């Protein structure tokens, strides 16, 4: 263990007992001091410790200070010593080089001073001593360390500190009583270092502590001079805590710390720091009274090391130990402040110093960015210095959280280069609404506020603070510098609730919410509340509700609450009692009223009523609704009318009596107002006069009808009286024979409704109303009846009717004079039976109509779709009607249809039945005069070449039609004269080898050609100037453009048809190569201009160019015996290659197919 530097130097001699006399106490200083004891200028023959001189010394003219020393007889190292030895002792302070000597001279008590410090080195012994009070002010400590190293053997060393605490009084000396000193043993180590602890109570810190040291070693005892001190003057505080450094808003380095908490006085601090940067190195030592120090000229990339210690400011004290060193290094980019917490609408600024490659960037080259996405305009920049740039954000909006980031990042950049460090900007909306209300007893005020509208920050706390003014509120509330916090409890609904109790009704309570965060504090806008202005009164008491008798109004009464004493307004809500009350509101502004009456539609219902109140001037809140009050249903008026009634007549033929049973329905509450105690039947006859009969609550009465006329009236009676308006019924023998109902018809509409209609004949009697009566026949069912006004001629009965049952309907006319003769029917009318049987038509007919419309629409759409598939989607064989029923999954189908056809195919009907194959053969001439050589417009296509001489088919002028539904191997195209839009059917090309031709076939073709072109309207042979008709030609096809204004003369096949038909099924077999199928599309010209075609090899859709329309057709015959060797001159310069329309069978070679496939085809006429 290393001894502290504050200690007491002890002088040890074995077997020596030294007694130092003293008269005065040395005052202990707050700093370290040294106690030195020196022998007198007498030389002794004993061995002194090393470093102590034997030379004598003077006391600079003063008398010697004599210290007596008693020696034991057992001493072995001393010689020629008297029994007493005198020593000089000196107290030497760090603050003073002179020594104060304590001596016991003849003149009395005195201090000997001005002793040179060399005396301590020549002879005597030295002690370092320092004493102080701990910071907890409970323990006084002294450290002692010997500076003289004893060369002798060190015996058991014991050190005691003797002390006494004395209260200091002015003018009185310190006189401790004998035996008043207390002793504490000090803890000593092997290196002669001791520590002594003296307990001191807090109440005696200002007392004087007298003490001296008692040192025992090897049988010798040494008493040090007396010392004195006040503990409060030597307090040593603990080192400062929480050392921290940061860059301030102005760019300075702020060193801050916190002072010890137990010190009873203010401290001063000593700060030492060093700065190390690439451009500067410096050290400083400053003393401040605050707990912070600002260091200016801070540069990026610098390192600072700081230590702090403290001591009493306004009195003596001891410096504390130095705090632990704290190191702080600035970044290459310095933001000050690095983080800002502010509220919405405020203006804030950031400063920046940018260091790039050991060089500080000029502030004029710095640019600012927000979140690295938005460049801040230069109008918001300010140049603070050569290297400090400033940016200002005015009127800030609340920060929108982006994931876990609850702030905006502000970047300071060197033109186009940005460092990864950034400043953080937190903007919070602190508009928190605080609402308060005072209870009805005026004893407490409850305030509520919610934080749902603001953004919560991690580490932030919320606190309500308030300031109470003596009277009322200021015009503009503001945050007062002196405020008090208020504890608020979080409720289940998310609101915080604070209670002020007791309260001052007229004082102004200014409140705001403070948001505390490590970055700073924010205050919400303050609001000022006067408890008297936010009173919520108690609800009115003694609320009653009733329906007033004879008047029929809802009367409500209440009592005003005791508090507050202001004038109050009242609000009443009332409604029919039930699960969900439909409230109606009524307000009362007359403060003197305590009751009111309101009209209600139903006087016989139970009403619920509640009342609440509020200050008449509008301040404060509405009170809670009072406890509901309910009305009691009682009779408020006499019944409005008596019940409607009817009768049943029972005749007893044996007794010749008629019994009448009156039937009536109980009155409803709205008619009885509000109950019926009994029913009274009033009778009147000419013989017996008038009498009444009380039947109680029964709803029928039977009496004997004995006179010609008997009138009855049924009255309803409640607690107030009998009904005033009643129904009368007179039973008269003569009137029962009056018949004015001519007919009655009943029509069942459904199982719950039957319609009745009737016809009346003129009558002189005054008809009042009808009674309609119905029941099920053949059963003793209850009779049902209704009263119908006299003006009605048709009426609908709503009841449950069984269709299989028969009903009896009776219609009674009721006159003033009595009941007339009824019209009775025992079943529905005949029309009614029909209507009943056909009742299902009302449901079935709409369904059938809807289904028909849907089916018709489906058929129309299907027809259009089929037409599109069969006509416009060619060449897909699956969309063609001729392919229906064929299995294209079998290879034999394709082989049979498209590969080998050695036999001729019988001509069949068109694929679409609604369209005509050919009605006639017409030839239109396209020339204007006989001299013009214009080719014909429409000519038949002969599929074979029969003999022209054996048959003739002539073209005449007749307009008749020749139908070829069963014609074989021939297709005739026709254009209807009445249709302006040309139409093409289909054509087939078949060729056979020349060797296979029969002579008859050749003759038939020659005859056809010669006869058909020999008529008056036929084409002259000269029109084919460049064409030659050869017998060996197997097929030809003439087609040309037709002018839209020219008409086509009709060609009629009236002759030679039989000859042509003879060849049906007898065509020779073909032996040429495999032939391909060609397709020809048919559409209008306008549509063809924008249409496309599909090639056979490439399978690519290609548009039809406009210049290919109305082009000539050229039939290429290479291996097909050359039907046409030269092109037909058809009146246009263009040429067109023909491809057949339908997939009939043609025998052109594959090479011809390829040539034709590369052409544009059109066959519109």
UniProtKB/Swiss-Prot annotation:
Start and end residues of each Fibronectin type-III domain: 239-332, 539-634, 642-736, 740-834
Placement of sequence motif WSXWS motif: 622-626
Tissue occurrence: Kidney, liver, spleen, lung, brain, testis, uterus, ovary, corpus luteum, theca and granulosa cells.
Topology in membrane: Single-pass type I membrane protein
Region (Required for JAK2 activation): 892-897
Gene responsible for this protein: LEPR
The protein's role, per its UniProt record: Receptor for hormone LEP/leptin. On ligand binding, mediates LEP central and peripheral effects through the activation of different signaling pathways such as JAK2/STAT3 and MAPK cascade/FOS. In the hypothalamus, LEP acts as an appetite-regulating factor that induces a decrease in food intake and an increase in energy consumption by inducing anorexinogenic factors and suppressing orexigenic neuropeptides, also regulates bone mass and secretion of hypothalamo-pituitary-adrenal hormones.
Organism of derivation: Sus scrofa (Pig)
Signal peptide: 1-21
Listed name of the protein: Leptin receptor
């Amino acid at each position: 263990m290393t001894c502290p530097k504050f200690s007491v130097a002890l002088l040890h001699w074995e077997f020596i007992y030294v007694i130092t006399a003293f008269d005065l106490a040395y005052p202990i200083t707050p700093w370290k001091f040294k106690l030195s004891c020196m022998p007198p200028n007498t030389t002794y023959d004993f061995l002194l410790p090393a470093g102590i001189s034997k030379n004598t010394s003077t006391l600079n003219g003063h008398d010697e200070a004599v210290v007596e020393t008693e020696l034991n007889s057992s001493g072995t190292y001393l010689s020629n010593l008297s029994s007493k030895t005198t020593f000089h002792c000196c107290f030497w302070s760090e603050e003073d080089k002179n020594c104060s000597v304590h001596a016991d001279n003849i003149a009395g008590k005195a201090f000997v001073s001005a002793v040179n410090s060399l005396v301590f080195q020549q002879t005597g012994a030295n002690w370092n001593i320092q004493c102080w009070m701990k910071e907890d002010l409970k323990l006084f400590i002294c450290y002692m360390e010997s500076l003289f190293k004893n060369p002798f053997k060190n015996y058991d060393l014991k050190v005691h500190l003797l002390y006494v605490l004395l209260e200091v009084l002015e003018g009185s000396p310190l006189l401790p009583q004998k035996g008043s000193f207390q002793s504490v043993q000090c803890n000593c180590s092997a290196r002669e270092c001791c520590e002594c602890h003296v307990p001191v109570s807090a109440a005696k810190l200002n007392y004087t502590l007298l003490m001296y040291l008692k040192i025992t070693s090897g049988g010798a005892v040494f008493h040090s001079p007396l010392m004195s001190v006040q503990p409060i003057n030597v307090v040593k505080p603990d080192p400062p805590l929480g050392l921290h450094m940061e860059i301030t808003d102005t760019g300075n380095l702020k060193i801050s710390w916190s002072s010890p908490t137990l010190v009873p006085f203010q401290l001063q601090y000593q700060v030492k720091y060093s700065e190390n940067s690439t451009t500067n190195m410096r050290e400083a030592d400053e003393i401040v009274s605050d707990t912070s120090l600002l260091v200016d000229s801070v540069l990026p990339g610098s390192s600072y090391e700081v230590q702090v210690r403290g001591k009493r400011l306004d009195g003596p004290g001891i410096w504390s130990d130095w705090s632990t060193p704290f190191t702080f290094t600035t970044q290459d980019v310095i933001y000050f402040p690095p983080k800002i917490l502010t509220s919405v609408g405020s203006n804030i600024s950031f400063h920046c110093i940018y260091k790039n490659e050991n060089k500080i960037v000029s502030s004029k080259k710095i640019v600012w960015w927000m979140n690295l996405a938005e460049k801040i305009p230069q109008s918001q920049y300010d140049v603070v210095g050569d290297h400090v740039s400033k940016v200002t954000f005015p009127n800030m909006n609340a920060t929108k959280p982006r994931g876990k980031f609850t702030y905006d990042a502000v970047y300071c950049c060197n033109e186009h280069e940005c460092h990864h460090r950034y400043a953080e900007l937190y903007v919070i909306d602190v508009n928190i609404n605080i609402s308060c209300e005072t209870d009805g007893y005026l004893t407490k005020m409850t305030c509520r506020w919610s934080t749902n509208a603001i953004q919560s920050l991690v580490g932030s706390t919320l606190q309500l603070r308030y300031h109470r003014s003596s009277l009322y509120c200021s015009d503009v509330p503001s945050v007062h510098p002196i405020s008090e916090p208020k504890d608020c409890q979080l409720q289940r609904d998310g609101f915080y609730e604070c209670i002020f109790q007791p309260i001052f009704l007229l004082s102004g309570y200014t409140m705001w919410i403070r948001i505390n965060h490590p970055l700073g504090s924010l205050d919400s806008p303050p609001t000022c509340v006067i408890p008297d202005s936010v009173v919520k009164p108690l609800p009115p008491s003694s609320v009653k509700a009733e329906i007033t008798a004879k008047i029929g109004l809802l009367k409500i009464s209440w009592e005003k609450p005791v508090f507050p004493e202001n004038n109050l307004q009242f609000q009443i809500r009332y409604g029919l009692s039930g699960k969900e009350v439909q409230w109606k509101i009524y307000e009362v502004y007359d403060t003197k009223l305590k009751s009111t009456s309101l009209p209600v539609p139903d006087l016989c219902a139970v009403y619920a009523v509640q009342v609440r109140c509020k200050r008449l001037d509008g301040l404060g809140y509405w009170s809670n609704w009072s406890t509901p009050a309910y009305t009691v249903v009682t009779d408020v008026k006499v019944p409005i009318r008596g019940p409607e009634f009817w009768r049943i007549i029972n005749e007893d033929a044996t007794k010749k009596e008629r019994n009448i049973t009156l039937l009536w329905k109980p009155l409803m509450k709205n008619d009885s107002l509000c109950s019926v105690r009994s029913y009274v039947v009033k009778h009147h006859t000419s013989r017996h006069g008038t009498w009444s009969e009380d039947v109680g609550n029964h709803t029928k009465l039977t009496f004997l009808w004995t006179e010609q006329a008997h009138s009855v009236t049924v009255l309803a009676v409640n607690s107030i009286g009998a009904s005033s308006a009643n129904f009368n019924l007179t039973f008269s023998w003569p009137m029962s024979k009056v018949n004015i109902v001519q007919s009655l018809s009943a029509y069942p509409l459904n199982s719950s409704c039957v319609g009745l209609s009737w016809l009346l004949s003129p009558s002189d009697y005054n008809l009042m109303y009808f009674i309609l009566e119905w029941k099920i026949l053949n059963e003793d069912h209850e009779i049902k009846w209704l009263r119908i006004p006299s003006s009605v001629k048709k009426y609908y009965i709503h009841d449950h009717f069984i269709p299989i049952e028969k009903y009896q309907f009776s219609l009674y006319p009721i006159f003033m004079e009595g009941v007339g003769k009824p019209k009775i029917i025992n079943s529905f009318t005949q029309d009614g039976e029909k209507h009943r049987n056909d009742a299902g038509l009302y449901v079935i007919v709409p369904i059938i109509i809807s289904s028909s419309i849907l089916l018709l629409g489906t058929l129309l759409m299907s027809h259009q779709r089929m037409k599109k598939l069969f006509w416009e989607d060619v060449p897909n064989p699956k969309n063609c009607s001729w392919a229906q029923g064929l299995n294209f999954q079998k290879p034999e189908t394709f082989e049979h249809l498209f590969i080998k056809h050695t036999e001729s195919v019988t001509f069949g009907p068109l694929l679409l039945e609604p369209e005509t194959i050919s009605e006639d053969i017409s030839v239109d001439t396209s020339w204007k005069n006989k001299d013009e050589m214009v080719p014909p417009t429409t000519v038949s296509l002969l599929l074979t070449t029969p003999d022209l001489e054996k048959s003739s088919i002539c073209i005449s002028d007749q307009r008749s039609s020749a139908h070829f539904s069963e014609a074989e191997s021939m297709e005739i195209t026709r254009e209807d004269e009445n249709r302006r839009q040309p139409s093409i059917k289909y054509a087939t090309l078949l060729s056979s080898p020349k060797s296979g031709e029969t002579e008859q076939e050749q003759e038939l073709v020659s005859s056809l050609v010669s006869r058909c072109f020999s008529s008056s309207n036929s084409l002259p042979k000269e029109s084919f100037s460049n064409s030659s008709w050869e017998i060996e030609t197997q097929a030809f096809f003439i087609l040309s453009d037709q002018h839209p204004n020219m008409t086509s003369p009709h060609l009629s096949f009236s002759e030679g048809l039989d000859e042509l038909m003879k060849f049906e099924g007898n065509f020779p077999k073909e032996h040429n190569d495999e032939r391909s199928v060609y397709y020809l599309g048919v559409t209008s010209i306008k549509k063809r201009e924008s249409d496309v075609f599909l090639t056979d090899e490439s399978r690519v859709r290609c548009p039809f160019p406009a210049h290919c329309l109305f082009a000539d057709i050229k039939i290429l015959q290479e291996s097909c015996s050359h039907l046409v060797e030269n092109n037909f001159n058809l009146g246009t310069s263009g040429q067109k290659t023909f491809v057949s329309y339908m997939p009939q069978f043609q025998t052109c070679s594959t090479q011809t197919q390829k040539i034709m496939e590369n052409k544009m085809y059109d066959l519109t006429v």
